[in-house]
A protein has these predicted regions:
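LRR N-terminal entry segment and analogous cap-like coil->beta motifs
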Residues: 2-85, 105
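Intrinsically disordered, low-complexity linker/propeptide segments enriched in Ser/Thr/Gly/Pro
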Residues: 22, 29-31, 36, 168-171, ...
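The leucine-rich repeat
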Residues: 55-64, 82-91, 109-118, 136-143, ...
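Consensus "Asn ladder" position of solenoid repeat domains
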Residues: 53, 77-80, 104-107, 134, ...
Length: 215
């Protein structure tokens, strides 16, 4: 194993909680992740596609804390087995300040991860955010739509989530993002009550293109 990989795994062993099953000695899969991230970032391409790589939270933690990502404008982390823990790290990554497109489809991020993105000071340049199939309910969806930090967001994709599954009793304060013109809520669990609640809270106010198909 190269010295660079050795340093990388020393870092991974430091950040992984002691109660996890991650091996202390790297296997071929671990080496692939480290090499993949190093090679992908080293190209300098502003569009980084890491979809289907099964990085997990630990891989994203390594990416966010060990790599300079300031050249990125687009990042695709779909199908990577991410939870809210990985997203919390990503949302705090200072070198992602120039990111305008973030694709996180088919993970397990949930409402907690949505709140982390909504509260992020780093991701303020995001214009497109795709979150298809991520176990997101009304709380997480509305946190994004009313985020004071995501002031440039124009497209939000929440297809195949859990919006409408459980009716909220408390709604977030503030107004919907003024620049948000496209909202995809296709294939959720939205009924008349959810639509009425969202209308009353002002969530649809700036929307010009709304997809409510298959609800």
């Amino acid at each position: 194993m190269s010295r660079a990989n050795s340093i990388a795994f020393q870092f991974l062993n430091m950040i992984v909680p002691p109660n996890t099953n991650l091996k202390m000695k790297p296997n071929k899969s671990d080496l692939h992740v480290v090499d993949l991230l190093r090679e992908s970032v080293a190209t300098g391409n502003p569009c980084l596609d890491l979809s289907y790589e099964r990085l997990g939270n630990t891989g994203v933690l390594f990416l966010a804390r060990m790599k300079d990502l300031s050249h990125l404008t687009q990042l695709n982390l779909s199908w990577n087995e991410l939870t809210s823990k990985g997203i919390e790290v990503l949302a705090q990554c200072g070198s992602l300040a120039g990111l305008n497109t973030l694709i996180l489809d088919a993970n397990e991020i949930g409402d907690e991860g949505m709140h982390a993105i909504a509260e992020s000071k780093t991701l303020s340049c995001l214009k497109t955010l795709s979150l298809t199939k991520n176990q997101i309910g009304d709380s997480g969806a509305l946190a994004l739509i009313k985020s004071a930090n995501l002031s440039q967001l124009s497209t939000l994709d929440l297809e195949l989530n859990q919006v409408g599954k459980e009716r909220l009793t408390k709604f977030p304060d503030g107004t919907a993002i003024a620049s948000l013109s496209r909202l995809n809520l296709r294939r959720n669990q939205i009924g008349d009550d959810t639509i009425l609640d969202w209308l009353q809270t002002g969530a649809f106010a700036p929307i010009k293109h709304l997809n409510l198909g298959w609800n």
